[in-house]
Amino acid sequence: LNIKKYNAPNLMSKCGGDMSRISDKEALNLIENEDLKILGERASAIKSELHPNKITSFCIDRNINYTNICWVDCKFCAFYRHEKDEDAYILSYDEIDTKIDELLAIGGTQILFQGGVHPKLKIDFYEELVEHIHTKYPQIDIHGFSAIEIDFIARISRITIKEVLERLQNRGLFSIPGAGAEILNERVREQVSPKKITNETWIEVHKTAHEIGMKTTATMMFGMTETDEEIIEHWRRIRDLQEITQGFRAFIMWSFQSSNTKLIEEHPEIKKQSANRYLRLLAVARIYLDNFPNIQS
């Protein structure tokens, strides 16, 4: 692969050169062998081709975790608590409002609103919560609830995923985040989060959201036990869905933070990911995910 000539298919009208879509094999070669400077230059060029005005945007937002109670027990997570733990919580409306007021004071426009997968909360709780926020703070975009939260709300409430999404959308939910994807490979998921939803269910939730006109983001957490091939499988799954729906507004990735997790106890060989590794994967993701308009960090 001559990376200096590579151009994504959706850039055909803007540039010349080899228009073929990058394959999994080519992506693996880039990860393993290509010079980081060349990767960065090509990824930056693709960004400039997609966004010729050379504007890089940002959003002032705030993470609000409405509960830390969760039954899924992911091995990579140091956040969750069980219902009877002393430091388990569900935020009150007043506590949520205080956090949003603090966000507004610094010019914020969005909340990333999610939590643990609470074993008892049903759709009515979430409808009332979203409606409260949207009614009191209509200027704030609610980017909330991961695919596993949506799936469990559907199951415990005995309704469909589509109904959950539509009901929350009607109350003010703007978009949903990509959390819960980690690595979309069943071997990895069985190892690090065996109680979590499957690849297919994560895809189904996002596809359903796109079908009702709700945008979402796609995410990836790397640096656990996955291989480079499994990272590329993850990218392929989200690229394939984007080809159908065009519903992802951005791709975001981050590295595994191992402190106080069960996963690092079970796999002490896991090493902290370097800045070079992050930049390498970020650049190849920009090249591979040719139908994603934005890479977010």
Language model: regions and residue ranges:
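N-terminal pre-triad scaffold of radical SAM enzymes
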Residues: 40-81, 88-114
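Flexible, acidic/Gly-rich N-terminal and inter-domain linker regions that tether
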Residues: 1-72
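Conserved C-terminal portion of the radical SAM core fold
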Residues: 115, 136-137, 169-181, 200-262, ...
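Radical SAM/AdoMet-radical enzyme domain recognition
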Residues: 74, 110, 123, 127-221
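Alpha-helix N-cap and loop-to-helix initiation/capping positions
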Residues: 3, 91, 121, 125, ...
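Active-site mouth loops of central-metabolism enzymes
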Residues: 62, 80-93, 149-160, 191-196, ...
